[in-house]
Curated annotation (Swiss-Prot):
Family assignment from sequence similarity: Belongs to the DNA polymerase type-C family. DnaE subfamily.
GO CC, any one term: cytoplasm
Alphabetized GO MF terms: 3'-5' exonuclease activity; DNA-directed DNA polymerase activity; nucleic acid binding
Organism, scientific name: Saccharopolyspora erythraea (strain ATCC 11635 / DSM 40517 / JCM 4748 / NBRC 13426 / NCIMB 8594 / NRRL 2338)
Subcellular location: Cytoplasm
Protein name: DNA polymerase III subunit alpha
Keywords assigned: Cytoplasm, DNA replication, DNA-directed DNA polymerase, Nucleotidyltransferase, Transferase
Lineage of producing organism: Bacteria, Bacillati, Actinomycetota, Actinomycetes, Pseudonocardiales
């Protein structure tokens, strides 16, 4: 017998974060299976899921009923204190197992609200947004005043047992419950307000039912049956319980954990719902159909409208006319000698396209933002993405590359055949990005500008970890780690989904055999895995997109849901694709750290050299810059610092800007797979001939391919080829380019027909056509956007220019930018040593907050010292400026403000060496600083009361220092042993600065290593090599016990340049535990392990290394052997090698091994070329000859 339908109106999806476990797609799939005509969505306090819910409904044909389970303040939404309605004895937990008074500890009640039409949905957007902005107190709360203002188009119910009416009934306040229901009846209308009934087997639900039905009868209201659905199917109850434990931090066996009492919190079938409700409360289930029938289409909410901000000057000019006026205004700033006809023609073409597409306002807005930022001294990137191909963007100072000069194509950015909107990403100094955002808010309206939401999801490994914790608590992490390590390695930073592990149809199923074996043999793993599958992919939290900003011509309130963060920033409740789909303008305001580095470096250049460098007008022909790149010394240079990239630069020997652009485009997996990067380098340097694709195409394609030596490197080249030989428009050519990139055979076959016909019309033979198509097709899959490559190449050139010409200033800025990354700091400090730039310890007289260039040296910033906050640094610098440099330690204490006279701060500064220049040893100051600070603080307090002068009181302030209570302190010349001093320095700075315990020990460690740690962690190891030998000093040991009771250890091993973790598992730990002593040198052999971009070593062998000879007898050095491929030997290399050796003159003999096809020839150099292996020799040799170019022979 057919069952009447039922519509679920109280449904929580995963957007009820860490409370709802129903994925929207799965929810609709189940609703389809159950043949439901409609389904509702009522997430807790937000409408973030409305767009996904609506789109899924359209796909399935199920009617969407979009709503919210709202939080209502018990009084005013502006009142942010608990409110209780009952007697004190009714609070806490009542006989039904829930709080007997207002929920949320007196903060809110609940109400279910459903949008009846588009107006109602917009009103729900507004209500939820204002609740977040104005009513946030534990939850985002509305109040009756707000609900009454926006009640139009909304159907409401009394909600769950925590609703206002139910709460009053629980408190035995029937009159108040009746009054509340009457008030809401008046607000929404009798036909739009229902009494909501639930039953999950809880006494609290049934205890209020009689009162609700009585109120319904007396007020003429209808009851409606709902199920408080939080997951899709009954078998997901356990996963939902685990999700609640993730939210609360509890475990499943914790009796105090938050859990759902009762059962049935899933999408029940119509039969299940009607079987109960048709008997208990006839008509309650039918009313779900009544509500569903009354809900109208929301289509208008999702209709696309041009919501781009409008621009006017009040004169009545069109936006095109305003744009033309700006072009005319700024054209002379770009072409002071006058624009060419080519330039003027292109301006018109671009203006016409923008006007036709309706994007003139967009360019006016973007131009305004970038020019304002530049006027405020905020460094702006030269352009990224295809926007750099626009001449108008260049003229308006949006970008900084002349597309005519660099061969960049506007049609790659926008063309008449292209439907997608233009997208100009803006890079700003990352410390000042927020200023640009605030300007946009001030200019275009706080109600029309918002940042964009993102959703953090529970990914594969996090799901495993969460599941392990909720089942086993802290000990579960060991099991989670075991499972995670058994997973196949991630591809493109994505792990195999848990479903793929057990799905034979999944493409990576075969790789997951180890995980399946664990699941089959270990019940704990099986349990964790099953729960993790239920957690994986659910939304964990909401965040803010790193760069996306929405701008609108109309208020965003009511257009999309909004969310107010604790800091007051307004965020869209939908992600940016959803916002763009309804016509909102999305822009990217990116914070680029390299622009901050450039800005800091330029300030120091101005201060130290009195030179104002305007990067926008910097020539691209600086010889020192290209020489630096050709030597591969690009560590710290934007986009060019990786080990492989440095090798490519040395092979390429760049001589012009186009080479840097090509490097950016070629050093990627696609081109490298076909060796295009090396082909470019070899063709450029004459090692390989430049061959035409086909003889018939040599002349036609010469202008297009000559800059890349006959190779197709850029997407723009594919477009230009189609235009030149097939007669395509550039817009049509862009469609061809995109089709080629997608590689769909049926599409490609169709495109080839048009391409072939076009070439035949141009007179080309089929042989040439087929050869060109066969050549272009694979290249199209990885050809790069030249505009983007050129924009980033310009930033790369700027950073390389400063490193080559102002090394101290640039490296100081680079160190400041990476102050929070100790691994990178170590690498860059090593690079400073290689460059001959000395990094000086922090100093209370010379240091500022950040690293600063002092002559040709760099001074450490005081903010890098542990326990020294920015307020202390500011105080030290201000006092120094107001009262003069500190002449002694006591002078420092005398002059300093109380904030800097703190024992912990002073001790940290002493250990970091910040007082070294004042004449006392660190050890002596450490012995006396506490007594000195006590004396000074006491006197400063008295002085603040007008009682004493620090050094003697009264008018005798200039008297003898012997009258000072500090005069009795006896500072001795004793100093800590070097090892201890360096240990303290590292403790305070995170790094060794004044010296390194391994200084002079390179020659002693060299026989035990085949690679340096910096090369290892920087990815410069040989391809396919998984075994490595390294040597260094142990700077940290974490000793652990595994679940079987066996000890193991994680050892931090560092050399002069970098550090890496070495794992000694139980077997190797047992063999080598005696070698594992902090601050001792050790050599390790092991297997390279790389997970999520982090390198570690699994040790298989270890041996202690005696480096005492580094200090006691440097004259007994073994020979230092330099390996040189014979094929590379020429006069310039020999001259550079001589210069390098003589620059590091010392006592270590040098041998040269010439490696040729017929064997190795060893040459012993004369004593004129003996070296010191300290202070950067090895780094310079690597820069000249490549990694692995030296060894030591005893």
């Amino acid at each position: 017998m057919p069952v009447d339908p039922f519509v679920h109106l109280h449904v929580h999806t995963e957007y009820s974060m860490l409370d709802g476990a129903a994925k929207v797609g799965a929810l609709f799939a189940e609703a389809q299976r159950l043949e439901m005509p409609a389904v509702g969505m009522t997430d807790h306090g937000n409408m973030f899921g409305a767009d996904e819910f609506y789109q899924q409904a359209k796909k399935t044909g199920i009617k969407p009923i979009i709503g919210i389970e709202a939080y209502l303040a018990p009084g005013s939404r502006f009142h942010k204190k608990p409110v209780f309605w009952g007697e004190a004895k009714q609070r806490g937990t009542d006989e039904y197992g829930e709080g007997g008074d207002v929920s949320g500890a007196g903060a809110y009640t609940h109400m279910t609200m459903l949008a009846r039409n588009a107006t109602g949905l917009r009103n729900l957007f507004t209500l939820s947004s204002r609740a977040s902005m104005e009513g946030q107190y534990r939850k985002p709360r509305m109040d009756r005043e707000l609900v009454a203002e926006y009640a139009e188009g909304i159907i409401a119910t009394t909600g769950c047992p925590s609703g206002e009416v139910q709460t009053r009934l629980r408190l035995r306040q029937f009159d108040e419950a009746m009054q509340a229901a009457s008030d809401y009846k008046d607000i929404f209308g009798a036909e739009n307000f229902f009494l909501e009934l639930m039953d999950h087997g809880l006494p609290i639900e049934r205890s209020v039912r009689e009162g609700l039905l009585k109120i319904a009868k007396e007020l003429g209201l209808k009851p409606v049956a709902t199920n408080d659905s939080h997951y899709v199917t009954a078998d997901q109850a356990e996963s939902h319980g685990a999700l609640l434990c993730v939210q609360s931090g509890k475990t499943l066996n914790d009796e105090s954990r938050f859990k759902f009492d009762g059962d049935g919190y899933y999408l029940k079938s119509a039969a299940e719902m009607r079987e109960y409700w048709d008997k208990e409360v006839p008509g309650a289930a039918d009313n779900t159909l009544l509500i569903a029938e009354r809900v109208e289409s929301y289509e208008d909410v999702w209709s696309f409208q041009d919501r781009m901000p409008r621009v006017t000057d009040g004169s009545g000019k069109t936006e095109r006319q305003l744009l033309e006026a700006e072009v005319e205004q700024y054209l002379p700033t770009r072409y002071p000698e006058g624009a060419t006809q080519e330039c003027l023609d292109r301006i018109k073409v671009e203006l016409d396209v923008l006007d036709t597409k309706g994007y003139c306002a967009y360019f006016l807005v973007v131009g305004d933002l970038t020019r304002w930022a530049k006027s405020q001294g905020i460094h702006v990137g030269p352009g990224r993405g295809s926007a750099a191909g626009s001449l108008l963007a260049y003229i308006l100072h949006i970008t900084n590359l002349d597309p005519l000069e660099h061969g960049l194509i506007f049609e790659r950015f926008l063309n008449p055949e292209r439907d997608s909107p233009p997208d100009i990403d803006l890079d700003f100094d990352d410390r000042r990005r927020d200023e640009v955002l605030q300007y946009a808010i001030d200019k275009y309206g706080r109600d029309k500008v918002a940042q964009v939401i993102t959703f953090g999801k529970i990914k594969t490994k996090a799901a495993i970890k969460d599941s392990a914790r909720v089942h086993h608590g802290q000990p579960g992490f060991a099991i989670a780690d075991k499972i995670s390590k058994a997973l196949p390695p991630p591809i493109a930073a994505k792990d195999i989904p848990l479903s793929g592990i057990v799905d034979p149809q999944h493409e990576r199923y075969a790789e997951a055999a180890e995980v399946r074996n664990l699941i089959e043999t270990d019940p704990s793993v099986s349990q964790i895995f099953d729960t993790a599958r239920g957690l994986e992919g659910l939304i964990r939290n909401a965040g803010v997109h790193a760069c996306a900003v929405i701008l609108s011509s109309q208020p965003l309130m009511g257009t999309v849901p909004l969310w107010a963060r604790d800091d007051g920033s307004i965020i869209t409740g939908w992600d940016y694709p959803s916002c763009e789909a309804i016509g909102l303008l999305k822009m990217d305001f990116l914070g680029l750290s390299n622009l901050t580095i450039l800005g800091d470096a330029l300030k120091m250049v101005k201060a130290n050299h009195d030179r104002e460098i305007d990067l926008s007008n910097l020539g691209l022909d600086d010889a020192k810059t290209y020489e630096l790149l050709a030597r591969g010394e690009s560590l710290g240079v934007f986009q060019l610092e990786g080990g492989g990239m440095r090798e490519l630069l040395k092979r390429m020997q760049p001589t012009e800007f186009a080479d840097i652009v090509a490097c950016n485009a070629l050093y990627r997996p696609g081109p490298m797979e076909v060796n295009a990067h090396n082909d470019y380098a070899d063709r450029k340097n004459g090692k390989k001939p430049v061959e035409p694709i086909h003889p018939d195409l040599d002349e036609p394609l010469k202008d297009i391919l000559s800059e890349t030596y006959g190779l197709i490197v850029y997407q723009e080249q594919i477009m230009a080829i189609a235009q030149k030989v097939a007669g395509y428009s550039l817009g049509r050519a862009d469609i061809l380019r995109r089709a080629m990139g997608k590689k769909k055979k049926e599409v490609l076959d169709q495109e080839f027909e048009g391409f072939q016909a076009g070439m035949r019309e141009q007179g080309f033979r089929d042989e040439a056509i087929d050869k060109l198509w066969a050549t272009v097709l694979p290249f199209a899959g990885y050809a790069f956007n030249k505009s983007h490559a050129a924009g980033y190449a310009l930033v790369a050139y700027w950073t390389a220019y400063l490193k080559a010409n102002y090394p101290a200033e640039y490296m100081a800025a680079l160190l400041t930018s990476n102050g929070d990354n100790k691994d990178k700091m170590a690498v860059y400090l090593a690079e400073c040593r290689r460059m001959g730039v000395k990094v000086l310890s922090p100093d209370v007289n010379d240091s500022l907050n950040d690293f600063t260039a002092v002559g040709s040296d760099i001074r450490f910033g005081l903010s890098a010292v542990r326990n020294v906050g920015s307020n202390v640094v500011a105080s030290i610098a201000k006092v120094r400026e107001d009262k003069g440099r500190y002449s002694s330690f006591t002078d420092f204490l005398d002059k300093s403000e109380t904030v800097a006279c703190n024992k912990r701060v002073i001790e940290s500064l002493i250990k970091a060496g910040a007082f070294d220049s004042l004449g006392h040893t660190r050890m002596s100051l450490a012995q006396h600083h506490e007594a000195a600070v006590d004396a000074v603080i006491g006197l400063k307090r008295q002085q603040a009361l007008g009682q004493f002068d620090l050094f003697g009181g009264g008018d005798d302030a200039g008297g003898e220092e012997s009258s000072s209570p500090l005069a009795h302190l006896q500072f001795t010349p004793d100093e800590w042993p070097r090892k201890q001093m360096l240990s303290y320095e590292r403790e305070m700075l995170g790094l060794y600065v004044s010296a390194h315990p391994l200084d002079g020990a390179e020659r002693l460690l060299a026989p035990y290593q085949d690679t340096g740690i910096a090369e290892l962690v920087g990815g410069e190891r040989e391809a396919g090599k998984d075994q490595v030998k390294i040597a260094g000093m142990i700077s940290g040991i974490q000793r652990r016990i595994n679940k079987n009771g066996h000890p193991w250890a994680i050892v931090t091993l560092e050399d002069l340049d970098a550090s890496v973790e070495v794992l000694f598992f139980p077997k190797s730990y047992e063999m080598f535990a005696d070698c594992l002593v902090e601050d001792t040198a050790i050599a390790v052999k092991g297997r390279i392990n790389e997970r999520e971009g982090t390198i570690s070593i699994f040790a298989s062998d270890a041996v202690p290394v005696d480096i005492s000879a580094a200090e006691t007898d440097p004259g007994t050095s073994p020979a230092f052997v330099i390996k040189v491929p014979a094929s590379r030997v020429d006069r310039s290399l020999v001259a550079e090698l001589k210069r390098t050796l003589q620059a590091h003159s010392g006592t270590v003999p040098v041998h040269v091994k010439l490696q040729g096809p017929r064997g190795v020839t060893r040459l012993a150099l004369s004593s004129d070329y003996f070296v010191s292996t300290e202070n950067g020799l090895q780094g310079e040799l690597k820069g000249l000859l490549g990694a692995g170019c030296f060894e030591t022979v005893l």
